[in-house]
Amino acid sequence: MSTLPWIQHLVIVPVLLPLIVGALLIPINQTRYGLKFALGIGSGLLLWMVSVALLLMADGEHWPAGIGVYLASNWAAPVGIALVVDRLTAMMLVLTSTIALAVLVFSARRWDRVGVSFHSLFQFMLMGLNGAFLTHDLFNLFVFFEVMLAASYGLVLHGYNLRRIQAGMQYIAVNLVASLLFLIGVSLIYAASGTLNIADLAGRAPALGAQDTWLLQIGATVMALAFLTKGAMWPLGFWLPTTYASASAPVGAMLVLMTKVGVYAVLRVWLAVFGAEAGGMSHFGLAALTAGGMATLLFGAIGMLSSQDGGRMAGFGAIISSGTLMAVIGHSGTAVLAAGLYYLLGSTLAMAAFMLLIELTERIRPPGSAMLALTMEAFAVEDKPEDPVGVGLPGTFTFLGLSFVVCALVISGMPPLAGFVAKFSLFHALLAASPEAVPWTTWLLIALMVVGGLAAIIALMRLGVRIFWASGVVKSPPLQVTEAASIGGLVALCMALTVQSGAVFDFLGRTTEGLLRSQDYPQRVLGEQPVQRVPQTEVPR
C-alpha cells in the first residue's frame, strides 16, 4: 500500500477530536454558554457518527478478520503506538458517544453553568475514554486512564459543596493509589517480557522462563488491582456509592461508563495474554476474578437494600453490574461472553438514564429532602440568581414515572425488558457450558444474580413509591425539554435493545468469536506495515 486512504484515519478521530475541541474551549469566556454548548454538542455528534462508521467497518469486510490497525506516526508495532479497532472496541465507542450526547443535552442551560470548564473537562474525559478503548499497549492504556481520571477529578467536584468535596477527595485519593499500582504492574510486566504491546506480549508470554513467568504474573496481578479498583470490585469499590451520590447527575452518568472501562481492560488483556493459547498461564487468575465478581454482586445487593438515597442506590446498582460482568469474564466461552456483553449494554444505558432521572425526581420531593437540599446548595455557588430550572410540562409525572419503571426493570433484570433477556441468556449459557455436571460455582453465581435482581427491584420500587406516591406534591415539577429528550432517548434505546435483541446477539456472537480467536491480533497488529511514502519526482526546469 503506497498511500493511506483517508478513511483509515477515522481510527484516530475519537482521540484527536475531543482533544482539539477541549483545547479550543479553554480560552473561551465562561459566560459564553451557547458557544461552548454548540462546540461540545458538535463534537459529540461527530464522535457518534465516526463511532458508528468504525462499527460498520469492523463488522463488515473492510479489514481482515474485522480488525483495523492504525500505526501512529507511521511506526510499526511493537515499537510504535498501535490503535486497534475491532467489534468490541467499536461497540464501546458507540456506547460512549451515545451516553455522552445524552449527558451534554441534559446539561444544557443548567449543569454546564454551575462551576467552570465543564465542557473542556468533558471533552478531555471523552478523549481518555476513547483512547483507553482504542490503544493496544499497556503504557498508553495507563496514559489514557490518567487523562480520563484527571478530567474526572474536576468533573466530580463540579458544582462544588462540602459533601461533594469530601467525596471527591476520597475519589481522587483512591484513584491515585490505583494509578500507582497500575504503573508498578506495567513496570513488572515490561521487566519480565521486554514489551508492553498486548499482541507482542501474547506471543512472548508462553515462551518465558519460570522466573520471568512468575514476575509477569505478579505484574499482571498488581495491574489487575488497578483495573478492578476502577471497576468497583469488592472490597476495592468502597468509594463508588458515596461518589455517585455526591456527584452531579451528568457526571454520575459518565462515571457509569468509567467503571466499565476497568472491566473492559480486564477482558481485553486477559483474553489476549492469558487465553487458551497461553500455555501454562492459560486462564491465569480467572477463578479469583469469578470469586471476586460474586462477592461484589452480593455486596451490591446488600448495599441496595440498605440504601434510602437514589444516588447511593445507583452506585450499588453499578457495583452489581460490575460484579456480574467480572464473574462472567471468569466463565469464558462464546455464548457466556456474548450474553455478558448484552448485559453490559443494557445495564449501562439504564444506569446512565437512572442517574439523570434521579435529579429530576428530587424536584418532586419536599424541600426538606436531604438530596434536594444538597442540589440547592450546589446551585447556590453562583453569585447571580440561577435561571429557572424549567417549566411544568404536560404529562411530566407520567413521563418520569414510566422512565423510572423502565430503568428499574432493566437494572434489576425483571421481565420483559433487556435486563431480563440478558440474565436469561446468561443463565442458559452458563448451564449449557457444562452439559454433564454443572459446577457448584455456576449454581452459586446464578443464585447470586437472582438475589441481586430481587434486591434491586425491591429497593427501586421502594424508592419509586416514596417519590411518586408518598411525596404529597400535586404540581408538576419543573422540567426542561432537553432533560426530557436526553432521558427519553436513553430509555428508548433500552426498549430498542429489547426489541432488536436477536440482531444484537448476532453481532455480539461475531464479537466474542473474534475475541476468542486470539491469534488474529498478533497477526494483524504486528503484521501491519508502515505506509511507504511515494517519492516525489523532480520537475525539470
What are these regions (language model features)?
Residues 155, 205, 244, 270, ...:
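Interfacial segments of multi-pass membrane proteins
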Residues 6-17, 85-96, 138-151, 216-229, ...:
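Structural signature of hydrophobic alpha-helical transmembrane segments
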Residues 31-33, 118-212, 304-374, 482:
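Alpha-helical multi-pass transmembrane bundles of energy-transducing inner-membrane proteins
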Residues 223-287:
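Short helix-boundary/re-entrant hairpin motifs in multi-pass inner-membrane proteins
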Residues 247, 369-402, 453, 457-541:
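Cytoplasmic/organellar membrane-interface segments at the starts of transmembrane helices
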Residues 22-27, 52, 105, 127-131, ...:
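Alpha-helical transmembrane segments of multipass membrane proteins
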Residues 22-33, 100-112, 153-167, 231-244, ...:
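C-terminal ends of transmembrane helices
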Residues 1-12, 23-122:
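Transmembrane helix-loop-helix hairpins at membrane boundaries of multipass inner-membrane proteins
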